[in-house]
């Protein structure tokens, strides 16, 4: 049950988790030209994965992606870490920079519960057409709306709405995505390619 305290070191849980991690090991051991094998392994590993998804190895996931649901056209750069003790839902056309962490697991603040190694989990939801910058960390229970940009190095502790640029530690909305973003893209450089 989402949000409920439990002991993750239970032997039955650990045995099941190890089976999932075996496939993740195989994925990370693939050679660069083995694209079809990578795609087949992701279909076995993930709860759901759409077309044209690409994850640069190494991928790290507590359950090897078993609780991960990716839409189509998702790209993840090196070292994507998915703490998938609960479900992670990702829409279409999402880009993860290198070294991004999406964590569904947390631990209580109360020292006695931590001494017992108690844990809780909360689903994470990331909308479509979201860009998550390098080194960002998304924490349990967070929802990020469609068309949003999460800046590099951000720590996302609370929900972020659709259509904004959000940055920082903790991550906060910097500004809405607006007309200026259809004219310039990086340090005032003019967009000179056709827009959709």
Specify the residue positions occupied by each region the protein language model found:
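Conserved catalytic segment of ABC-fold P-loop ATPases
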Residues: 145-148, 161-163
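Short-chain dehydrogenase/reductase
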Residues: 131, 149, 165-167
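Short arginine-rich
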Residues: 26-28, 158-163
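Terminal amphipathic alpha-helical/low-complexity segments used for targeting or macromolecular assembly
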Residues: 1-52, 171-196
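Short glycine-rich donor-binding/catalytic loop of glycosyltransferases
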Residues: 153-154, 159-160, 171, 177-178
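Flexible, glycine/small-residue-enriched loop-and-beta-strand segment within the central core
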Residues: 32, 59-143, 169-171, 175-187
């Amino acid at each position: 049950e989402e949000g409920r305290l439990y002991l993750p070191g239970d032997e039955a849980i650990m045995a099941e988790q190890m089976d999932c991690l075996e496939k993740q090991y195989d994925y990370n051991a693939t050679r660069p030209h083995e694209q079809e094998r990578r795609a087949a392994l992701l279909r076995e590993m993930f709860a759901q994965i759409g077309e044209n998804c690409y994850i640069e190895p190494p991928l790290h996931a507590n359950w090897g992606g078993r609780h991960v649901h990716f839409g189509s056209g998702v790209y993840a750069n090196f070292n994507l870490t998915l703490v998938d003790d609960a479900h992670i839902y990702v829409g279409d056309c999402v880009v993860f920079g290198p070294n991004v962490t999406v964590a569904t697991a947390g631990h209580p603040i109360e020292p006695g519960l931590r001494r017992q190694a108690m844990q809780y989990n909360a689903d994470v939801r990331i909308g479509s057409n979201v860009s998550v910058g390098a080194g960002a960390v998304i924490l349990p229970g967070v929802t990020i709306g469609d068309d949003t940009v999460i800046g590099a190095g951000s720590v996302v502790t609370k929900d972020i709405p659709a259509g904004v640029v959000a940055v920082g530690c903790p991550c906060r909305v910097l500004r809405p995505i607006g007309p200026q973003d259809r004219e310039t893209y990086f340090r005032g450089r003019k967009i000179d390619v056709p827009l959709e």
